Structure formats: C-alpha cells, structure tokens
C-alpha cells in the first residue's frame, strides 16, 4: 500500500483520514463507500496515464534512467521557471493553501490537469474556474510576493 503519511492527505470524498489510494489515479480515500463514489468520477481515460507512471520501486534498473532524466531536467536552461526550495517549503506551510486543497472539486481539477493530454487547453479551462484561480493566486502570492504587491 502507498504511504499516506503526508499531514495534508485526506479522503477525496469525505475529507476524513485516508487509509487507501485509488489504483487508477492514486487519490486517497478512507473506505469502500468513498471508493465507490470516487470510482464513479474517476476517469477511465486516466488509467493508461497512471499505469505509465506507476513503476517499480526506485531501486530498479529503470529508475537509473529516470534519475538521469530528472538530472537533465534540473540542469536545463529553464532556471528562471523553477521554484526555490524555500518557496516550496512556504507553499507546504501555508494554511490558506492547505484549506483550498481540502476542496474535492479543486483536487479533481488538478488531477484532470495532471493526467490530461492537452495541458495548455486544460489549463485555460481550469483558469475559468474561480476556485482554481483562487488556488493559483494563492500559490503565486507565496512564490512571488513582491509581484503581488506591485500589481
């Protein structure tokens, strides 16, 4: 079973403490009834994506290729697009962000965006949702506070 030690992990349906993860999309859930409710909404289109992502443990031979891919990405020219470790920590400690992430609708939007094929189109659609815009603004306010004040 996947580790559910994250302090912010809650059941995607009822927001209780989860015990399990959906084998398709990996969202946490706490019981069979919650899984059944989630399963109705869990997209069958997401299954191939998750199967590609779900791989053997990090110790396998394939992970060595993944490690070099990550290293290549980290050494890419897109340094200005990267969030600093301190800002990542600030995101993780934000109570406002945590409370937004408890919303099942926002979680489903993020899962759809993560698993979708046309991310640019999905991002445009998500940015039409006031809840997602509030989430994005909260993240940007934490990561780029000086730009938020200037606007």
Swiss-Prot record:
Question: Bias category Acidic residues: which stretches?
Answer: 63-81
Q: In which tissues is it expressed?
A: Expressed in the cerebellum.
The source's domain of life comes to Eukaryota
Record's compositionally biased regions (Basic and acidic residues) = 43-53
Intrachain disulfide bonds: none
Provide the residue positions that the database annotates as binding Zn(2+) 2. 22, 25, 38, 42
A GO molecular function assigned to this protein is:
zinc ion binding
Q: Which GO terms describe its cellular component?
A: cytoplasm; nucleus
Zn finger (HIT-type) start-end: 11-42
Q: Any idea which positions bind Zn(2+) 1?
A: 11, 14, 30, 34
Query: Does Manganese appear among the keywords?
Result: no
Gene3D superfamilies given in the database record: 3.30.60.190
> Where does this one sit in the cell?
Cytoplasm; Nucleus
Q: Could you tell me which Pfam families the record lists for this protein?
A: zf-HIT, ZNHIT3_C
Among InterPro entries, the record links this protein to: BCD1 (IPR051639), Znf_HIT (IPR007529), ZNHIT3_C (IPR048371)
UniProt region (Disordered), positions on chain: 43-81
Q: Which UniProt keywords apply?
A: Cytoplasm, Metal-binding, Nucleus, Phosphoprotein, Zinc, Zinc-finger
UniProt main location, coarse: cytoplasm
For the modification Phosphoserine, which residues carry it? 76
Binding partners and assembly: Thyroid receptor interacting proteins (TRIPs) specifically interact with the ligand binding domain of the thyroid receptor (TR). Requires the presence of thyroid hormone for its interaction. Interacts with NUFIP1. Interacts (via HIT-type zinc finger) with the RUVBL1/RUVBL2 complex in the presence of ADP.
Instruction: Give the PANTHER family listed for this entry.
Output: BOX C_D SNORNA PROTEIN 1-RELATED, ZINC FINGER HIT DOMAIN-CONTAINING PROTEIN 3
Q: Any idea what this protein is called?
A: Zinc finger HIT domain-containing protein 3
UniProt gene name: Znhit3
């Amino acid at each position: 079973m996947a580790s559910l030690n994250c302090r912010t992990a809650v059941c995607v349906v009822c927001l209780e403490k989860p015990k399990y993860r959906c084998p398709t999309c990996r969202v946490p859930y706490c019981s069979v009834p919650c899984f059944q409710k989630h399963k109705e909404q869990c997209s069958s289109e997401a299954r191939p994506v998750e199967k590609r992502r779900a791989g053997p443990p990090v110790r396998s031979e394939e992970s060595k290729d993944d490690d070099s891919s990550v290293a290549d990405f980290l050494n890419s020219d897109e340094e200005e697009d990267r969030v600093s470790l301190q800002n990542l920590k600030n995101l993780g400690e934000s109570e406002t962000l945590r409370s937004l992430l408890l919303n099942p609708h926002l979680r489903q939007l993020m899962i759809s965006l993560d698993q979708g094929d046309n991310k640019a189109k999905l991002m445009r659609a998500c940015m039409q949702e006031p809840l997602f815009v509030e989430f994005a603004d909260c993240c940007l306010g934490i990561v780029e506070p000086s730009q938020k004040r200037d606007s």
